[in-house]
Amino acid sequence: MMELMVVHPHIFWLSLGGLLLAAEMLGGNGYLLWSGVAAVITGLVVWLVPLGWEWQGVMFAILTLLAAWLWWKWLSRRVREQKHSDSHLNQRGQQLIGRRFVLESPLVNGRGHMRVGDSSWPVSASEDLGAGTHVEVIAIEGITLHIRAVSS
C-alpha cells in the first residue's frame, strides 16, 4: 500500500479528498469541505506535475487555508447584503412596526388585544380606543405592541 502511495501520490490525494467530501456529506457542518476540496486539487496537480511529499503537504495546507478564507469572504459579503427585514426573522414583533391594523375590540385603560393574521397580540396605547379604530404599531416591548390611533 505504501509503495502505491509513493509511486502514485495523486491516488492518495484524490482518495483522501473523496473520503473527506463523503464525510462532510454525512456530517454536514462544513469543517471537512475545504480540506476535501484542497486534497482533490492537490491530487490533480500532483497527477500533472510530480512534486515531492514536502511540497504536496505545503500545497495542501495552503489550498485548505485559501479555500476556507475565500468561503469566509464570500459568506461575510452575503451576510452584509442581507435585507434588513431578514435580520428580524425570528422577531415577528419587529416586523410589525409601522404596519396598520383595525382594532376589533376596544382598549380599556389603554390595554387590550389586537388580531394580527392568525394570532392575538397584547397591545397598549396612551389612551382608550374603540373597536374599529385604525391603529399603527409604533414600538414593541417584550410581546406587547405599542400602538397609536391614525386617521384612515
UniProtKB/Swiss-Prot annotation:
Domain of life (superkingdom): Bacteria
Lineage: Bacteria, Pseudomonadati, Pseudomonadota, Gammaproteobacteria, Enterobacterales
Keyword Zinc attributed: no
Species of origin: Escherichia coli (strain K12)
GO cellular component: plasma membrane
Name listed for the protein in its UniProt record: Inner membrane protein YbbJ
Stretches in topological domain Cytoplasmic: 22-31, 76-152
InterPro entries tied to this protein: Membrane_assoc_protease, NA-bd_OB-fold, NfeD-like_C
Gene name of this polypeptide: ybbJ
Subcellular location as annotated: Cell inner membrane
